[in-house]
């Protein structure tokens, strides 16, 4: 590099230092993209640009990557560190032809032919000055801010106005050694590399910016011309005896109520506010498997995000995370209750579209909403909706509402060409702002209507809320799912969309359940959730710190060595760090006496802390049931444990949306881990190591309240085999209330009528209701449930059932 070049580049860097702020995707390219630092790197960029090179050089050193200005020297041959597909675009005339850049690829391949040990990593790098997708009717603005092929003058304005929104995206490296070995090194391979690179950069831009935005009025006009809405307008006019024009005006009102009005400028402003907000609220946000979602976008999938719903913060968190992960924030289905001024208009311009909680047989509204959703899919916008329909008040997943999933499936049946993929998202927080409100609502207080004052109230209480967790779960390809459920589904494409095939509703229910299962499969076992789970299982919700840390070490090892699914995540650090983190959040009480430190939960918030336990209880329910078999039931063989767990698992699966692929192998792996941790020994059979029985006992308590509910249900079924489903639900709920009053059970879900409804539906499906031939099975499961309970609790249930039914 000449002195002149050096001075020029330093001057350019100094200017960019004040004008440019760069965000790197992914955040740690060397680690996230598995780059080998021992192998040479050459960057591939779409367009030759001095400012782009300067922006790239400003960040490479931070990540241990070579500077784009430093040439690569191989056997005394100096090679440019950057290969560009296109030359600079002059103010007048055509840009430089592609031969120069083709020659660069050819030279690189030739070097691999000469040196069989050489393996250059080609790393595609995309730079974006702002992320405005543009509008379908852009004219003057597009001419001034043309982003893909700007002249130096246009680039100057882009840096001046959008320099604080510079994104640099690194993509997976291509091994030239592999290319040379597999495909050869002649010029035709270089041509192929160039073509593939062009496609890659085009797709990458669409992932980063999204499709062109429509003019809202033009979109409305197009939707009103659709056959389904025209038909619905005619029916509305006929049924309500109004004119076609009046019915059409109603449809326009519905469209205006529903449709988003996405504004990139608002998103840019909002992300600044959200960056401040997250830094104020949380010490960090942990993200897992964002790369798999980026790849789905890159491969042309229509993405539908289906997260769990913990808090109103969910809307903001997912959009924020996706924006900084190099993806476009989705269009979000928001409840109409959030369409209040001024938040509603802001949400709408951030990509929210609003949906009524019930369509109440309103065919015109249904047609308008369905056609709008189809249009989002057709134009390639990602979509997000909460399948639970509302926020969970207990921390467990709610039973899914199937309306949006049914509409998504219906859109696929109407002939979407691109693959449609549902991406389950687990959201977790060390602190949910509304959790105290949830407790009040569960205690009978009326739910407050959303308003601006609630938002101000929440912001006023900003504090240290610990960390947030965003885990992307196992994706579900809709076309593959439909082929699995109904191999002949493609034959329905040409039929009337109003006529649903017989398999449609059952398939929707299966899909909704799978979504919830995959959300739980991506759970984050955080410091707060694990500590809450352990302390709530202890007597008086308190443990010596050393005992708590031992139990945490056991659970951390179990969840890491016997993962619930490959998509779960576990708290980083050891048990001491976990406890320190929790104490720093002021969620637990630390007291000292002469014998040491005691960690406890304030009795006033014990019920509230059950919310966090319930986020991950499904991860520990099978290990807890195994421990209960060993401690309470004194089971001594693997086969007996498997038989008991298999009896209860269908109910656990329905209640907790579990999805263990091979239950028996999972049980074996847990028992092996308990043996490895020296809690259990195995010779002729399984035996408890007495010195560690307290750890097994504590583990067993996690499932105890669940087993109490099952004992109530199966004792009732054994006494009254022909009981009606509604009576079983009611009697179970009444007995649960009595048991709770006598034994101090305060967990909200213990009294949740909806939970007993879920269980009764599953019992009917399994054939346990009104089936005399199943009485042997019912009696066996009753005996198992009774045997796993403390004697006092068991006797209360037996006596209460006998008194209730006069035996």
UniProtKB/Swiss-Prot annotation:
Membrane topology term reads: Peripheral membrane protein
Tell me which SUPFAM superfamilies the record gives: Glycerol-3-phosphate (1)-acyltransferase
| Major site of localization recorded for this protein | membrane
Look up the record and give one Gene Ontology term from the biological process aspect. Answer: CDP-diacylglycerol biosynthetic process
UniProt remark on domains: The HXXXXD motif is essential for acyltransferase activity and may constitute the binding site for the phosphate moiety of the glycerol-3-phosphate.
Q: What is this protein called?
A: Glycerol-3-phosphate acyltransferase
Going by the UniProt record, its keywords in alphabetical order are: Acyltransferase, Cell inner membrane, Cell membrane, Lipid biosynthesis, Lipid metabolism, Membrane, Phospholipid biosynthesis, Phospholipid metabolism, Transferase
**UniProt short sequence motif HXXXXD motif, positions renumbered to this chain:** 308-313
Tell me its family: Belongs to the GPAT/DAPAT family.
**Gene name tied to this protein:** plsB
* Keyword Cell membrane listed: yes
Compartments it resides in? Cell inner membrane
* Pathway(s) where this gene product acts: Phospholipid metabolism; CDP-diacylglycerol biosynthesis; CDP-diacylglycerol from sn-glycerol 3-phosphate: step 1/3
Gene Ontology CC entries for this record? plasma membrane
Which Pfam family would be a valid example here? Acyltransferase
MF annotations from Gene Ontology: glycerol-3-phosphate O-acyltransferase activity
EC identifiers of the protein? 2.3.1.15
Q: Check the record and name the PANTHER family matching this protein.
A: DIHYDROXYACETONE PHOSPHATE ACYLTRANSFERASE, GLYCEROL-3-PHOSPHATE ACYLTRANSFERASE
Question: What catalytic reaction does the record list?
Answer: sn-glycerol 3-phosphate + an acyl-CoA = a 1-acyl-sn-glycero-3-phosphate + CoA
